[in-house]
Amino acid sequence: MSIKNKFKSFFTLDDEEYEYEYIDEEREPVQEEKGTKDKAAFQERPQTGKQNVVSLQSVQKSSKVVLSEPRVYAEAQEIADHIKNRRAVVVNLQRIQHDQAKRIIDFLSGTVYAIGGDIQRIGSNIFLCTPDNVDVSGTISELLTEEEPQRW
């Protein structure tokens, strides 16, 4: 017997080996009165193509806001990871040197831009970094201090 015939006999069934038994059952007539009412009620309802489906992104466990006060530039990556994980971050840069704070803001601005989020100044050296799933409304007016000259 060739290999081809072996595969053929393995994958095919011989009809002679199996006899199918057909059982004829007598079925009781179904009461049409109840079924007709249910069908009529079902057909009266207008069929719309739109189902009640909820997007997975709209259902979240809970939103978190992370408060961060970096002391060195190396902590900027940890803040960026929070933003990438779709958490809003408030960054307080009051306890870091100005040049380091500027580098952190530049780094976070790139991160926020890459994910389609937003960065806003909410106070003196305090910034709010938000991903695209967080909407911020309203503004905070700047308070002028005696140290800062007025910019005309």
UniProtKB/Swiss-Prot annotation:
<keyword id="KW-0131">Cell cycle</keyword>
<dbReference type="InterPro" id="IPR007561">
    <property type="entry name" value="Cell_div_SepF/SepF-rel"/>
</dbReference>
<feature type="region of interest" description="Disordered">
    <location>
        <begin position="25"/>
        <end position="54"/>
    </location>
</feature>
<dbReference type="GO" id="GO:0000917">
    <property type="term" value="P:division septum assembly"/>
</dbReference>
<feature type="compositionally biased region" description="Basic and acidic residues">
    <location>
        <begin position="28"/>
        <end position="42"/>
    </location>
</feature>
<dbReference type="Pfam" id="PF04472">
    <property type="entry name" value="SepF"/>
</dbReference>
<dbReference type="InterPro" id="IPR023052">
    <property type="entry name" value="Cell_div_SepF"/>
</dbReference>
<keyword id="KW-0132">Cell division</keyword>
<dbReference type="InterPro" id="IPR038594">
    <property type="entry name" value="SepF-like_sf"/>
</dbReference>
<keyword id="KW-0963">Cytoplasm</keyword>
<comment type="function">
    <text>Cell division protein that is part of the divisome complex and is recruited early to the Z-ring. Probably stimulates Z-ring formation, perhaps through the cross-linking of FtsZ protofilaments. Its function overlaps with FtsA.</text>
</comment>
<comment type="similarity">
    <text>Belongs to the SepF family.</text>
</comment>
<protein>
    <recommendedName>
        <fullName>Cell division protein SepF</fullName>
    </recommendedName>
</protein>
<dbReference type="GO" id="GO:0005737">
    <property type="term" value="C:cytoplasm"/>
</dbReference>
<keyword id="KW-0717">Septation</keyword>
<comment type="subunit">
    <text>Homodimer. Interacts with FtsZ.</text>
</comment>
<dbReference type="GO" id="GO:0043093">
    <property type="term" value="P:FtsZ-dependent cytokinesis"/>
</dbReference>
